[in-house]
């Protein structure tokens, strides 16, 4: 068996000797060499990750700021990996990188608030998505509290105040199941989505 590397593909080539009895009148033995080639793609993990990120950049997603406060401290981060799970009971799913500086505060506090951003919140999203100190992040906007004590952005389109009821392993991330305790909405305004590595307003359909 030979192993050949060709442009990122691994090729296994097997040469098999097959004995076959000739069915003709002479009754001769024949040995036939058969080469079987099979192409087995072996993905480069770095290439796959890069392609996945590029593909996910084409999936538009709402931009949110997720906050927490409690015994483990005040923290907040920008997130697009947020979605609805069910309305019975009302539950959101939030994905949080375990290497993120906010991870200990969020998981130890056990509460969070998902604040859905509007088109005017691009700068605020950048603050919460970078390495800006916590105090400076929160000083850039007005906040209040709903039921859990997590900061609720005053001019968010919607604020979902939640308790973390379950946590699952998702590779590099924790998958947080968050049961909603309180909701605050405001009328008007356009949403903010992240698409193709840039911010875009998301208005109501005409």
From Swiss-Prot:
GO BP: any one term: uracil catabolic process
EC top class named in words: oxidoreductase
GO molecular function, one term: FMN reductase (NADH) activity
Coiled coil region boundaries: none
EC numbers for this chain: 1.5.1.42
Reactions the enzyme catalyzes: FMNH2 + NAD(+) = FMN + NADH + 2 H(+)
Classification via InterPro entries: Flavin_Rdtase-like_dom, NADH-dep_flavin_reductase, RutF, Split_barrel_FMN-bd
Keyword annotations of the record: Flavoprotein, FMN, NAD, Oxidoreductase
Keyword S-adenosyl-L-methionine: no
Family according to the record: Belongs to the non-flavoprotein flavin reductase family. RutF subfamily.
Biological function: Catalyzes the reduction of FMN to FMNH2 which is used to reduce pyrimidine by RutA via the Rut pathway.
Protein's name in the database: FMN reductase (NADH) RutF 1
Organism: Rhizobium rhizogenes (strain K84 / ATCC BAA-868) (Agrobacterium radiobacter)
């Amino acid at each position: 068996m030979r192993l050949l590397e060709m442009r990122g593909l691994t090729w296994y080539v097997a040469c098999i000797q097959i004995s076959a009895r000739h069915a003709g009148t002479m009754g001769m033995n024949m040995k036939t060499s058969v080469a079987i080639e099979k192409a087995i793609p072996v993905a480069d993990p770095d290439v796959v990750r890069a392609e996945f990120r590029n593909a996910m950049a084409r999936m538009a997603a709402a931009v949110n700021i997720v906050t927490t406060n409690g015994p483990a401290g005040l923290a907040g981060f920008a997130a697009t990996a947020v979605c609805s799970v069910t309305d019975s009971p009302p539950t959101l799913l939030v994905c949080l990188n375990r290497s993120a500086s906010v991870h200990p505060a969020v998981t130890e506090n056990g509460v969070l608030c998902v604040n859905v951003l509007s088109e005017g919140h691009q700068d605020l999203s950048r603050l919460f998505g970078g390495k800006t100190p916590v105090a400076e992040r929160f000083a850039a906007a007005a906040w209040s509290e709903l039921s859990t004590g997590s900061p609720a952005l005053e001019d968010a389109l919607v604020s979902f105040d939640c308790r973390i009821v379950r946590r699952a392993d998702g590779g590099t991330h924790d998958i947080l199941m968050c049961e909603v305790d309180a909701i605050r909405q405001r009328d008007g305004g356009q949403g903010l989505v992240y698409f193709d590595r840039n911010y875009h307003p998301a208005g109501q359909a005409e």
